[in-house]
């Protein structure tokens, strides 16, 4: 395992300035942040947990952690079964659960733009109110959409409709350096540059943190 630096009080102060009132240390860190729903793969408490609220906050946090060589683990609802959100090196956990807004629908292009903390079930129900369907249907309905995309979740409908990968049009990602990158487009076809979008889908948080998604919808049957 790579060697990382310890989180110092000075680093905690810098993080608190970015996300005041939403940076937790010591006994204030929720025990759930030490694992996902399959603790058989191991548990470890992070040194710091942060409830992020925006792309800009996550960017600023990542810049500090990158400069100080602090390990970072991104976490959604923690419903996974493979230990992917377990902070095995300690460090900082960034939770995206407070980034839960359905930002907008584009009925001309049949897309919806959401933050990564929106739950799959919440989008499915809201889309139906618009006469639209978000087809991916993984087994865990209360997983976040950011987590679904990070794992390229499938489900029973995959045989007919495909997996999550087939419904991601665009995303905003914060790289480990803190750089903010926009990938993809809301339209159904674009040939501008490399398909970085498909590199991110299924990467399980190893390449960056997804902070916004534009997803494809279809007319509800």
Where in this protein do the model-derived segments appear?
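Pocket-edge structural micro-motifs
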Residues: 25-27, 52, 74, 96, ...
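Short, basic and Ser/Thr-rich N-terminal targeting/leader segments
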Residues: 66-68, 75-77, 143, 167
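Residue-level detector of anion-binding/catalytic polar loops
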Residues: 70-71, 133
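Glycine-rich, histidine-containing beta strand-loop boundary motifs that form or position
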Residues: 74-78, 85, 96, 116, ...
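FAD-binding subdomain of flavoenzyme oxidoreductases
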Residues: 101-105, 111-221
């Amino acid at each position: 395992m790579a060697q990382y630096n310890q989180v110092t009080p000075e680093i905690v102060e810098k993080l608190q300035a970015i996300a005041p009132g939403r940076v937790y240390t010591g006994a204030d860190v929720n025990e759930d942040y030490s694992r996902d729903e399959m603790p058989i793969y191991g548990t470890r408490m992070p040194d710091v947990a942060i409830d992020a609220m925006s792309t800009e906050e996550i960017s600023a946090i990542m810049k500090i952690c990158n400069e100080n060589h602090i390990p970072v683990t991104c976490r959604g609802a923690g419903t996974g079964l493979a230990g992917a959100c377990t902070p095995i090196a300690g460090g900082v956990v960034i939770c995206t659960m407070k980034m839960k807004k359905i930002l907008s629908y584009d009925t001309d292009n049949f897309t919806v733009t959401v933050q990564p903390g929106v739950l799959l079930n919440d989008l499915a129900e809201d889309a139906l109110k618009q006469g639209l369907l978000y087809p991916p249907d993984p087994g865990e309905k209360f997983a976040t959409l950011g987590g679904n995309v990070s794992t390229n979740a499938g489900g029973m409908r995959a045989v007919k409709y495909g997996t999550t990968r087939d419904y991601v049009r665009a995303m905003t990602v914060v790289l480990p350096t803190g750089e903010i990158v926009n990938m993809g487009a809301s339209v159904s076809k674009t040939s501008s540059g490399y398909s970085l979008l498909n590199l991110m889908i299924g990467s399980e948080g190893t390449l960056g943190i997804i902070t916004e998604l534009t997803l494809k919808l279809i007319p509800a049957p």
